[in-house]
Amino acid sequence: GHATDLYCQAYFVYDSKKSGGLTQSHLRFGHSPIRSPYLVSAADFVACHTPSYVHKYDMAKNLKEGGTFLLNCGWDLDGLEKNLPASMKRTLARKHAKFYTIDAISIARKLGLGSRTNTILQAAFFTLTGVIPIDQAVTEMKDAIYKTYYKKKGQEVVDMNNASIDHGINELVEVQIPDAWLNAQGTPVENHNPAFIQDVVEVMNRQEGDVLPVSTMVKYGLEDGTWPAGTTKFEKRGAAVEVPVWNAAKCIQCNQCALVCPHAAIRPILLDESEETKKPAGFETVPAKGLKQYTYRMQVSPYDCTGCGSCVNVCLAKDCALEMKPLDSQLKEAPNWTFAVEEVEIKKDAVSAKNVKASQFAKPYFEFSGACAGCGETPYIKLVTQLFGDRMYITNASGCSSAYGGSTPSSPYCTDKKGFGPAWAMSLFEDNAEYAYGYLLGQEAVKRQLAAHVEALAEAGVAPDVCRAYLENANNAETSREASDALLDALENNGSEDAEFIRQNKEFLTKKSVWAFGGDGWAYDIGYGGLDHVLASGKDINVLVLDTEVYSNTGGQSSKSTAAAAIAKFAAGGKETKKKDLGLMAMSYGYVYVAQVAMGADPAQTLK
């Protein structure tokens, strides 16, 4: 702003993904004050920084006649012909657009900048828009880079970023739009997703949710605020620049990569003989170690991976069994993923909570969330759902975990093929523990009523052995599911009021695992009073505190969990007092079990 006399205005629109989501920047520049309290609908310049967006959004819709369109991609003209939707080709041609491409992803990788393409694309922006003279823009950008990085990172990092500016200017490619694009015709793509996903979720993910009528919400029973589980598996964002590729010959089958994956996008798969005969071409498997009846494969979902590289970093194989490769080269793995999760059954005899490897053969009931690439919180949530997910009640405090855990229309908590999975809800920041307590007390009240009806049936001689077996196992986490199923089977043809009540409330038959999730801002500070009350109750309730030692979701303010002298982004002066010992305070009751865990330090202790 200081480099020009122009007035400027900026509006930003974004989704609730913590990273890898959509951000729209609406910029205006002019010689007089700008008084336009609305978004840009006729733009001189439109840039698309993520190639996959051309298939998700109408990227050229708001481009002016004769405007400039910049696409960050690695496609030449043949690649553009193959990959651009017909509708976008027609729009660019009919608006006589000036069309440019730049492969910022490859440039960043070549310069050692990883996936950071922002400086490259900023240089391209100044080159194409002429908001300020390009020489002045380069000088200003390089001065800013020096001030930002020289003292903290050194001259090498400064040089890398300076080079990215030069490449952003020099490697722009102007595309001559073929005349044939005026009447481009595409091949219709069949959408096999459920009606709810097509009618509601996909519309909202296209940022068009404001056009949905109330009648659509009523049609799908959403008027009470409930939302179907497991919608994230239909998003297939393709947000990664690179994704891991599994080398079967080097793999030691430790499953550590699956444990640390923040998005459940890499999973160990076990196949029996029947499934082996049905596997698609290219679905390489090897004999499973310690499980001779099965074959083994580590499967990656390229469209759901965010490319963080945590799996590569944790690999215990001598020569590393995972290698990061460009996303485009691995899209062929998508059908393999579909086969692995849809056609291959979870092998219950291989699942165990006794060791890390066996725990990862369990289904994660938390997948493909909007958490940041490499998130350190979500692996813990995912692991908890692998252990207890089919019978969990979860309440969530405000914070990162609520943003990636349940921001409409994305629901990462999912169900298995039988329809079992976590029930998730969020109330206020300050009453999350009390909310979980209410969950517990409410389902206990219903269970007492159920027990009375089951007892009445037993006394009436209706399947007395089955009824008493249920009563004996109703609060046993390991056996209540089996006892509940047996009870429902025995009462299938019974028309009594007792049996009808049981059928209507069958979801409460099994022993529930009630959890309160939240960060240190909730547990140490804002919600501590309620948390203390619930812990003191002595009730069978669980709490997962995702302790990042700062208020993460709001940018990085210090909390009572922040260590003494620690500097946070918005607390640069350093913490003057020491970290609150929440675990010790809870243990002082004498009947509260506390486990302090760090997956990176000791995965086995974390699991225990």
Give each language-model segment a name.
Residues 34-37, 41, 108-112, 132, ...:
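Alpha-helix capping and helix-loop boundary segments enriched in small/acidic/polar residues
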Residues 1-206, 275-280, 564-568:
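Active-site cofactor/cluster-binding pocket
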Residues 16-21, 37-41, 61-63, 91-94, ...:
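Solvent-exposed alpha-helices and their adjacent loops that cap or buttress functional pockets
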Residues 68, 78-93, 334-351, 412-423, ...:
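Acidic, Ser/Thr-rich peripheral helices and adjacent loops at domain boundaries
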Residues 344, 404-405, 414, 495-496, ...:
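Thiamine diphosphate
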Residues 137, 141, 153-305, 312-393, ...:
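Ferredoxin-type iron-sulfur electron-transfer modules and their immediate structural context
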